[in-house]
Structure formats: structure tokens, C-alpha cells
Amino acid sequence: MSAGIYLHIPFCKSRCSYCDFATDVFKNEETVERYVSALIKEIENFESEARALSNVRASAAVDTIYFGGGTPSLLAPQQLEKILNSIYKKFSLMENIELTMEMNPATVTSETLKSYKSLGVNRASFGAQTFDDSELKRLGRRHSASDVRETIELLRGAGFDNVSFDLIAGLPRQTLKDWERNLDEALKLNPEHLSLYLLEIHEGTPLAEQIRSHRQPLPDEDLAGEMYELITRKTCRKGYEQYEISNFSLPGYASKHNSKYWLCEPVYAFGVSAHSFDGNARYANERDTAKYVSLIESNDSAEVFREETNLASEFIFLGLRLSKGIDLIEYENRFGINIKEKYAEDLQRLEELGLIEFAENRLKLTRKGMVYSNEVFTVFV
């Protein structure tokens, strides 16, 4: 079984109103350089860390690397090169790895992108979120719709032929027509991959407070469902395949790295708040950037959480996110559990509600089930 590597770069030019990730507003180059040094040290100390290595963690060859954030495209090419060199020295890498970097529009130049490409980055993922400038402003995004279009031109000019957009539906005050315009604008740019999410509200964010005080009204559940139906209809017409609840790709361009999470494959994660999975247990690093750096510099482990997983349960609710669903025979052979027998009453209820279906020894969500997936997942959590 192959593994992925995730590296968290927490710095952003500013914090978006809906963001619940571990991020820090970019202050100065010295802070970033110190963080990069800590990140490299954590990678170098990987095998000697307190998180006890299983055979999977020690032996799996790596076929994906993913820089997430935050805004990884704030890294200078020299910093990226140092991080990658530490990975190449430490891990066994397979050929033709997928190397993704998240980017924000208007944070990159043609020269920077060409440098990233020369260092092996072969997939770019960036958060367009919306093509409506007023919506971008309400979300606290620093870029404009024209910045997104310009960034795509820069990426293509630098030789990137695997580009992914993030878009968010169900934004405050957004109508179905607004969302359709956003989707049409994205499809005009012909990205190889689209991640299309319904807005999630996280407590403690400015947006959550604005919604609570009725300053930012949200679309109702029925409208959100219509927005999702529009996604599946329009992307299909343009040749995209829906391979996961929120992810659509042209043939051959599904995200290999993100698929590891849904298939319960190992991911070694480094950096502040990074979450790892070794095939048996999940690990999480310190969420505060300053504390993370201090721990690493003091030769301590940044790990603050470790938990053995109920893999039999996770395999179901994560696997159901995929359009192909779960192979029932493969599942029974792996875990010794007959899903139809163990969850008979719940499955009957969900099937009667039109949320799941059985087809050729597979259990999968229906189109309606993808809209109301949380109702299905709670059965297996």
C-alpha cells in the first residue's frame, strides 16, 4: 500500500471570515523561515518521534505530496526546495508522484510558478470560492474574480496541465442564479478538477457570528439542494466525472492524494495542526504555530493527540463519500462483517428514504443521498 505526505503551511495574507483552519496572518519572512526550519526538522526526526511507528508507517512508499494551508504559495521557491529535499532524503518515493500545491489567486508570479514547476510541483489547487466580487468581499477574500482568471493564465503559461478550483455554494444572500453564474465562469476556464462545496459554518468564525446576528442570511436547505443538483448536471455535460460527494474531474484527473483519506490509506502529515493516519491510528500536531515551532526547536514531539481508529466503521462512512461506494464482498473479507446483516434496519430505512442503493455487490449513496449524506454517515460513526 502506498502513502501520501501532507505538509501544512499556515500563513495567509489575511484570515477569511469562514475559515476554521489553523492559519496565521503573514507577518514577516523571518517567521516563515523559522517555521520552515521547524517543519524540516520534524521531517528529519520522523522515525525517532514519540508516535510509535507501525510497519505501515515505516515501509509504505510515497506516491503523493500535498502542500496545504494556509497559503503554501507564499513560500519562496528556495524554501520549497529545502522542504522537498528533506522529504526525498527521508522517504522512498514512487515514480510519477502527484505533487500538489494549494495557491491563492494573486499570490504568485509567472517566475514563481515556473520555479515551482521545475521543483516538481505538477498539480495546482486554488480557492477561487466565487466569481462574484461582492461575495468575495463578504467572505473576507483578498482577491478578485479577475485575479482568478489571471492566475489560470499564469499557470497555463508556466506549463501546469493539472489545475483544480475550489468553489463554495450556499453563500450568504446567494441565489440559484448567482451560483449558476459562478459555476459557468469556472467551467469556461476548463480546469481539470473542481472541488465544489456547500458552505459549512464553523463556530468561532466571524461568519458564524454574522449569521447568528442575521447580518448574513443563508440560503435554505431546499435551495442548497437545488444548487447541488445544478453542480452535478452542469459538470456532467462538460465531461466531468463525479468521483466523490464534492469532487469532480476530467477523466484521469481525480486527486490521488485526497482519495487516500476516503480509502483509509496512510498519510504522513507534518506541520502545525497536521493530522496523520498510519493505517491503524490517527495523530494530530499542536494547533498553535508558535507552540509547534517551540516544541520542534526544543527537540520535543509536536504530537498532542493519538487515537486508535475503528477502521471498520471509518471505512464505511469515508468510502460512501466516493461515487463508487463500498464493495460489500471486499469489506466482509477485510473485516469479517456483513454490512447488510449488521445494519439491516438502518439500511432498510435509508433505502426507503432514497438515500442509498445496492448495485452489483456495492453499497453507495444515491444522488439524493449525496445531498443529505450526513444523515447516512451518522449510522456508521
Where are the regions a protein language model picked out?
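A short, conserved structural fragment
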Residues: 351-361
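Short, amphipathic alpha-helical interaction segments positioned at domain boundaries
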Residues: 368-381
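Short amphipathic alpha-helical interaction segments
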Residues: 337-349
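Local cysteine-cluster metal-coordination motifs and their immediate loop/turn environment
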Residues: 10-21
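Minor-groove-contacting beta-hairpin "wing" of winged helix-turn-helix DNA-binding domains
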Residues: 362-366
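Short active-site neighborhood of thiol/selenol oxidoreductases, capturing the structured segment around
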Residues: 5-8
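C-terminal scaffold of the Radical SAM
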Residues: 1-3, 23-49, 55, 61-337, ...
